[in-house]
C-alpha cells in the first residue's frame, strides 16, 4: 500500500515517512501542493498538512480527491480551529490527525482506513456484480413470463377449439362473449387486470359442453326436463376442468363456468345463488352470454333482432340479471349494435345474401 506524505517541514515529513516504511508501507513524499497533486494518481493514502506554501492544504485535498477518488485523505493540522477541519472535510478529507503526530496512532488510523477502503471496494464490486445478475434475472424472468403468457393463450385457444369441434357456432359465440364481458367490465370501472383476465376467461364459460352428449347439445328443439338436467352439468364439468390450473385466468374461467347460469333472483343453476352471492364475473358473463345467445341462431331457435334483445335484457334487470351490470351493458348499446351489424353484414356477404329471421316466442328461457 502506498502512502503520500505532503508536508513542507522536512523533519516531520521524514519522521512520518521513516516510521511508515518500517511498518511496511511504500512511502512517497512531497513538500508542496503542486508536487503532491502530481504524485497522487496511484496512491492509497495521502497525509496532507493544512499549512503548505503556495497551494493550500484544503485545495490540495480537493484536487487529490478529484484525481484519485478512492484515495483515503488525512488532514494533518496543529490547529484546533474546527472551521478549518470542516472545510477540509467538505473538500473531501476522510479524517484528520493533530500535530504533534503520534506515529503509532497514525499507523493504526491508516491501517483501519485501508481495511475500510478494501471492504468498500469489494462491496461496491459485489453490488455491481449483483446488480448485473439481477438485471439478467429480470430479463430471464421477463422472457419466461412472455413465453408463459404465449403458452397460456395457446391453451385458451385450444380449449376454445375443443368446444368448436362439438358445436361450430360455439367458437364465434365464445369470442363475442369474451369481447362483451371485457367491455362491460371496463364500463363498470373494473381494474385493467380484471378487464384483461375476464376477456380471456369468459370464452371458456361453456367449455363443460364437451362433456354433454351430441344428442342433447345439438338437438334441434326444446330439451325435455331430463335432457335439461344433463345440459346443466356443463357448468360443473367446466369448473372441474379449469379449476385444476393455478393460472389466474383459468381460475377465473372456472368461476365463470360454474356461475354464468346463476340468476339475480336465485332461479339459476347449478346452486341457485342469488344477488351478491354470485361473483361479479358470473354476473357479467350471464348478461354477455344471454344477449349473444338471443341474437344468434341455434339448432333449437332463430335469432332475435338486436333492439328486441336489448329491451329484453333491460326488462329482466333486477330479476335475472344484476342491475349494475345491465346498466353498464345498456350504456354500450350503440357500440355493441354497430359491432354486431358489421359482423352480420360480413356473414350475409359470405352466405350469398342470406340472413336469419327471428321467430316469435323465443325468449331468454330458451338459452342453454
Swiss-Prot record:
Residues 350-360 have a biased composition (Polar residues). This is Cyclic di-GMP phosphodiesterase TM_0186. Its EC number is 3.1.4.-. A divalent metal cation 2 binds at residues 169, 205-206. InterPro entries: CheY-like_superfamily, Cyclic_di-GMP/3'3'-cGAMP_PDE, HD/PDEase_dom, HD_GYP_dom, Sig_transdc_resp-reg_receiver. GO terms for molecular function: hydrolase activity; metal ion binding. Residues 341-368 are annotated as: Disordered. Can function in vivo with either divalent iron or manganese occupying di- and trimetal sites. Dimetal is necessary and sufficient to catalyze conversion of c-di-GMP to pGpG, but conversion of pGpG to GMP requires an occupied trimetal site. Changing residue 289 to A: Lack of activity. The modification 4-aspartylphosphate is found at residue 49. A divalent metal cation 3 binds at residues 169, 173, 289. It comes from the Bacteria. A divalent metal cation 1 binds at residues 206, 234, 260-261. Pfam families: HD_5, Response_reg. Changing residue 173 to A: Lack of activity. It catalyses: 3',3'-c-di-GMP + 2 H2O = 2 GMP + 2 H(+). One of its GO terms (biological process) is phosphorelay signal transduction system. Residues 2-114 form the Response regulatory domain. Keywords: c-di-GMP, Hydrolase, Metal-binding, Phosphoprotein. It comes from Thermotoga maritima (strain ATCC 43589 / DSM 3109 / JCM 10099 / NBRC 100826 / MSB8). Residues 148-345 form the HD-GYP domain. Phosphodiesterase (PDE) that catalyzes the hydrolysis of cyclic diguanylate (c-di-GMP) to GMP. Hydrolyzes c-di-GMP to GMP in a two-step reaction, via the linear intermediate 5'-phosphoguanylyl(3'->5')guanosine (pGpG).
